[in-house]
Amino acid sequence: MPPKDSDSSTASGPRSKTTRPRAIRRLVIWYRRNAAVTSLVGSATNSASAAGNVAGTVVSSAGSVVSNAGSMAGSMLQPLVFDPLRRLQSSENNPEAEDIKNSDRLWVAVDGMGGDEAPGPILDGCLKAIQRLPLRIKFVGETEKVLGAVQAMGLTELFNQATAAGHLELVASGPSVGMDEEATVVRRKRDASINLTMDLVKKGEALAMYSAGNSGAMMASAIFRLGRLAGIDRPAIGALFPTKDPTQPVLVLDVGANMDCKPIYLHQFALLGNIYSRDVLQVARPRIGLLNIGEEECKGNDLAIRTHELLSEEHRLQFAGNCEGRDVLSGAFDVVVCDGFTGNVLLKFLESVGSVLLDVLRAELPRGRRGKVGSAFLRSNLKRIKKRLDHAEHGGALLLGVNGICVIGHGSSKALSVVSALRLAHSAASHGVMDDLAELQKAPVESA
């Protein structure tokens, strides 16, 4: 260590003798350690660089091989996997993506004047159905009102395209039957839209018909114009109810056509429902249930007890016994028969379940931030629940027992309900349900 310079020491001010040497020693130690670490890092870096060059060469060669193999595999697999996947995704996002052949389209007659707000929503639903389903539609209605609805709802372009393509045909009719008019008015208004719609089915110009109008007038017109099937005393209205299994609904009939029934009527309803469930819903052996207040054979009123005896002796169907109200939506039955009064009450009750359930859930969810977060997580689930319970998703009910496929819609039907109802009509027509229904013979027991 060099001797301390007195002049410099004086100039720099007083300083401790032990402080300066200790600081220098620490600096030297730090420098030596740093130099050693730097040397090690440098050699390691050089080695890593050399190894990286070698590995880079290998990886580059392997990468080119993998790239070439990937290109070959992609060219081979892409037409088999990715293209169909893209087509599937595009068709899901856009139902109109897949072209429908004209040869596959079936004629369906639509009562354009039937409904609370007809003809606007009915026409809107028909135009949407033409784009999504293999259908041609004969739209029966008062010409001026129909064309006015086209302008008012902004459907001019779609209407012109459908008519030009031959997918939509406007059939002029006279004054329609009002929603509040008596059913017998169809005898006086011979050129009403509901009567002309039935005539199209009777003449064979349409395979099915749909109306959201006066249900009593529709049933009367169907009986007068089409006639009842052989062996059927009273037609019945059959509606599809959701069950625990979203893919397998239950058919409930009658839901409003016959307020007072005899045992033989319910027996015939079971035969009609059995054929419809088998042909259209594709149930191999439909399980038939009789709506009652208990499972035991002795339960219920005189109508239920006598009907139970008839169904137990019927070999043309699989009778699964009495069905309590709690079992209707359980999935234990494929067809449930009842009188029209009870069935209509059950139908109207079910229509309210979806909205009431959502209202209860909204009321029970906590308010504030916790409620908003919980609602955000549950929103998609609640929408799916509402969709399964929404009567608009099922569209309509079938009038079974007449010589033609007739679908009855709700008076307040919107476009979605119309599309669903027309899908139901197309399904019944394409499965040839009328051929099997026409083969029904008179029920063996007539004294009941």
Swiss-Prot record:
Keywords: Cytoplasm, Lipid biosynthesis, Lipid metabolism, Phospholipid biosynthesis, Phospholipid metabolism, Transferase. Pathway: Lipid metabolism; phospholipid metabolism. Its main location: cytoplasm. It catalyses: a fatty acyl-[ACP] + phosphate = an acyl phosphate + holo-[ACP]. Catalyzes the reversible formation of acyl-phosphate (acyl-PO(4)) from acyl-[acyl-carrier-protein] (acyl-ACP). This enzyme utilizes acyl-ACP as fatty acyl donor, but not acyl-CoA. Belongs to the PlsX family. This is Phosphate acyltransferase. It comes from Prochlorococcus marinus (strain MIT 9313).
